[in-house]
Amino acid sequence: MAKEESIEMQGTVVDSLPNTTFRVKLENGHVVTAHISGRMRKHYIRILTGDAVTVELTPYDLTRGRIVYREAGKKPPTSKAEE
């Protein structure tokens, strides 16, 4: 259904913005604005600052993207008060 193939890149969430939008720093050093994909929204997958994610970019606009996957191994540190 897509006209062009999308570009998938790895990155790290740098900042959380309103309306489930995030700033993601990609492996190549570029910073893009990305939103959560519909499947991640449907399954209530939470994304926090510092999470490693996979971002899908279109060749038309390389400054905006869609977060399609959150790496399971990258968890934010927990506080001692919770233990």
UniProtKB/Swiss-Prot annotation:
Cellular location(s): Cytoplasm
One GO CC term on file: cytosol
The family this protein is said to belong to: Belongs to the IF-1 family.
InterPro entries on file: NA-bd_OB-fold, RNA-binding_domain_S1_IF1, S1_domain, TIF_IF1
Pfam hit, one: eIF-1a
NCBIfam families registered for this protein in UniProt: infA (TIGR00008)
Protein's recorded name: Translation initiation factor IF-1
Domain of life: Bacteria
Organism: Coxiella burnetii (strain RSA 493 / Nine Mile phase I)
Keywords: Cytoplasm, Initiation factor, Protein biosynthesis, RNA-binding, rRNA-binding
Location of the S1-like domain: 1-72
Function: One of the essential components for the initiation of protein synthesis. Stabilizes the binding of IF-2 and IF-3 on the 30S subunit to which N-formylmethionyl-tRNA(fMet) subsequently binds. Helps modulate mRNA selection, yielding the 30S pre-initiation complex (PIC). Upon addition of the 50S ribosomal subunit IF-1, IF-2 and IF-3 are released leaving the mature 70S translation initiation complex.
Molecular function terms from GO: ribosome binding; rRNA binding; translation initiation factor activity
Assembly information from the UniProt record: Component of the 30S ribosomal translation pre-initiation complex which assembles on the 30S ribosome in the order IF-2 and IF-3, IF-1 and N-formylmethionyl-tRNA(fMet); mRNA recruitment can occur at any time during PIC assembly.
